[in-house]
Amino acid sequence: MKISEEEVRHVAKLARLNLTDEEVAMFSRQVGDILDYVDQLNTVDTEGVEGASHAISVNNAFREDKVKDSMDPDLALSNAPEREDTDIIVPKVI
């Protein structure tokens, strides 16, 4: 599958990348080769194969939630350089 140099330039622009003409040509060839390789999956007979989200079966081991005592807020905030009630005061970043 061929990807045009114009498509590479478009994706580079979306990603805010400045590519040289040589890089555009190189990425066009490389992405085309990758897409050709992935396209080989279309030749595989998948008749009767059940879809899967993992290569091996995965089972989640859930447990019941248990309420536990938490750390005392004064102890948790004891190393905070600046605080107000149970909140840590931080410099404004915006």
UniProtKB/Swiss-Prot annotation:
E.C. no: 6.3.5.-
Catalytic activity: L-glutamyl-tRNA(Gln) + L-glutamine + ATP + H2O = L-glutaminyl-tRNA(Gln) + L-glutamate + ADP + phosphate + H(+); L-aspartyl-tRNA(Asn) + L-glutamine + ATP + H2O = L-asparaginyl-tRNA(Asn) + L-glutamate + ADP + phosphate + 2 H(+)
Alphabetical list of SUPFAM superfamilies matching this protein: Glu-tRNAGln amidotransferase C subunit
Naturally occurring in which organism (per UniProt): Desulfatibacillum aliphaticivorans
UniProt cross-references to InterPro entries, sorted A to Z: Asp/Glu-ADT_sf_sub_c, GatC
Pfam family, one: GatC
Disulfide partners: none
Protein name (record): Aspartyl/glutamyl-tRNA(Asn/Gln) amidotransferase subunit C
UniProt superkingdom: Bacteria
Keywords: ATP-binding, Ligase, Nucleotide-binding, Protein biosynthesis
GO BP term, example: glutaminyl-tRNAGln biosynthesis via transamidation
Subunit structure: Heterotrimer of A, B and C subunits.
Gene field: gatC
Stated family: Belongs to the GatC family.
Molecular function, one GO term: ATP binding
Organismal lineage: Bacteria, Pseudomonadati, Thermodesulfobacteriota, Desulfobacteria, Desulfobacterales
